Amino acid sequence: MSQIFAYCRISTLDQTTENQRREIESAGFKIKPQQIIEEHISGSAATSERPGFNRLLARLKCGDQLIVTKLDRLGCNAMDIRKTVEQLTETGIRVHCLALGGIDLTSPTGKMMMQVISAVAEFERDLLLERTHSGIVRARGAGKRFGRPPVLNEEQKQAVFERIKSGVSISAIAREFKTSRQTILRAKAKLQTPDI
């Protein structure tokens, strides 16, 4: 027999889920208190990082219904929401969002709504990639170096090369510069074959 669950999330401890529970009740959903899952966690946490939501997922079975007051209860961004709804749909769980008129997100209308959300999620992802790429290009143009800082500066590399030419062992040079033999060998190789 299918059951109805509600997921109520609040961000801070000084808030309560009372308004969300009342809104669900006003929409005509009669939910047993033990089937209302309340969680005090930031909205920026992905659903996979929400212990209460994960406990809810373990209880939901095919044919059950999940009621949320707002779409953001199902994820931290459009991509996370889409993933969560898809996961619930694959399990056979109907998801109702009261902020969208109580629409069942697994119905044809709900699926269309999720396609719009998917498009927004893809747009969001593309914008993020574009901003990241342009930020990297801008930083490189400004001379910003990526990765770990070099162990040896150019002056030290030149000193290493001079010591190698004068016959000092790689191990002795590594000890002198307080670094590994491999670092000295890399510096030697770089100086022997300068960038073309």
Curated annotation (Swiss-Prot):
Where would one find coiled-coil regions in this protein? none
User: Where is the catalytic site?
Assistant: 11 (o-(5'-phospho-dna)-serine intermediate)
Q: In the record, what terms sit under GO molecular function?
A: DNA binding; DNA strand exchange activity; hydrolase activity; ligase activity
Catalytic activity, EC: 3.1.22.-, 6.5.1.-
The record ties this protein, via InterPro entries, to: Homeodomain-like_sf, Recombinase_CS, Resolv_N, Resolvase-like_N_sf, Resolvase_HTH_dom, SSR_resolvase
Q: Gene3D superfamilies given for it?
A: Homeodomain-like, Resolvase, N-terminal catalytic domain
UniProt KW keywords: DNA integration, DNA invertase, DNA recombination, DNA-binding, Hydrolase, Ligase
Q: Does the keyword Ligase apply?
A: yes
Q: Where is the Resolvase/invertase-type recombinase catalytic domain?
A: 3-143
Task: Supply one GO BP term.
Answer: DNA integration
**SMART domains, alphabetized:** Resolvase
Family per similarity comment: Belongs to the site-specific recombinase resolvase family.
Instruction: Name the chain's protein.
Output: Serine recombinase PinQ
Please tell me the species this chain comes from. Answer: Escherichia coli (strain K12)
